[in-house]
Amino acid sequence: MPHRRSAYFVSDRTGITAESLGNALLTQFDMLEFKRETIPFIDTADKAMAVAEQIRQRAQSDHFRPLVFVSIVNPFVREAIQVDDCAMVIDFFHAFVGQLENELEQKATLTVGKSHGIISEEKYDTRIEAVNFSLNHDDGVKLKDLAEADVILVGVSRSGKTPTCLYLALQYGIKAANYPLTPEDLDSPTLPKMLLPYRKKIFGLTIEPQRLHHIRNERKPDSRYASIDNCRREVNEAESLFRHHGVPFISTTHKSIEEIASTILHHTGISRRF
């Protein structure tokens, strides 16, 4: 079995950018295992030198060069991470900012935290408002104000509606409500009455019965709710309902939350709100 390689994500802010880009690259090597560690808020030379020492020690103990993904704006802080002799360093920020400066004929401002900090109060408020809306309209708990929803996700229980709604709210500022199709809903050939006025906002989520059975069985083992026969019935009836009413839908079985959200935006034409 291949040796597990150490991978560091080093950032002057939250580490989200370094993690996202770094993991996007590492996932292309699915035959290897990685020991991942995120080190955020490295915003001084002293902190950077401490990180460099940590990486050096890891290189010694592993006998393999660690992979270091860096997203640090300040060049003096970045230069303090002197580990190029014992690690492979991928500097996301400075690898591209110089090329952009040349192309745009303008110097970068080199401002820390513009990707994930609160740059605009209006944009931040839009995100928080969307999150609150999604939380208040989760699982059909609150059907009031659905007219304000940008999209209403509909599907059987445990098909991925709630995490997708929250992701849409957090990442795009989209007001996403969701409604779980109950056995009573599935016995009817029509959409639930309370959803009919918002037909054009509905987007369906489905899932393979075997996967649904596995998820439900972890929550309520050996119950009728989790039985494979019941899962097959609910999924088949939900998909029939979607087709009958022309509701667009996708399977969440082999998709990440990010992929589900992107697919919904692509199908519906909804754009980010900030």
UniProtKB/Swiss-Prot annotation:
Keywords: Kinase, Nucleotide-binding, Serine/threonine-protein kinase, Transferase
Disulfide bond residue pairs: none
Keyword Kinase in record: yes
Substrates-to-products reaction catalysed: [pyruvate, water dikinase] + ADP = [pyruvate, water dikinase]-phosphate + AMP + H(+); [pyruvate, water dikinase]-phosphate + phosphate + H(+) = [pyruvate, water dikinase] + diphosphate
Class of the enzyme per the UniProt entry, highest EC level: transferase
Residues binding ADP, per UniProt: G155, V156, S157, R158, S159, G160, K161, T162
EC number assigned by the record: 2.7.11.33, 2.7.4.28
InterPro entries (alphabetical): Kinase-pyrophosphorylase, PSRP
Pfam families with a match to the protein in the record: Kinase-PPPase
An example molecular function term from Gene Ontology annotations: ATP binding
Alphabetical list of PANTHER family matching this protein: PYRUVATE, PHOSPHATE DIKINASE REGULATORY PROTEIN 1, CHLOROPLASTIC
Physiological role: Bifunctional serine/threonine kinase and phosphorylase involved in the regulation of the phosphoenolpyruvate synthase (PEPS) by catalyzing its phosphorylation/dephosphorylation.
Family membership: Belongs to the pyruvate, phosphate/water dikinase regulatory protein family. PSRP subfamily.
NCBIfam families: PRK05339.1
Protein name: Putative phosphoenolpyruvate synthase regulatory protein
Organism expressing this protein natively: Laribacter hongkongensis (strain HLHK9)
Classification lineage: Bacteria, Pseudomonadati, Pseudomonadota, Betaproteobacteria, Neisseriales
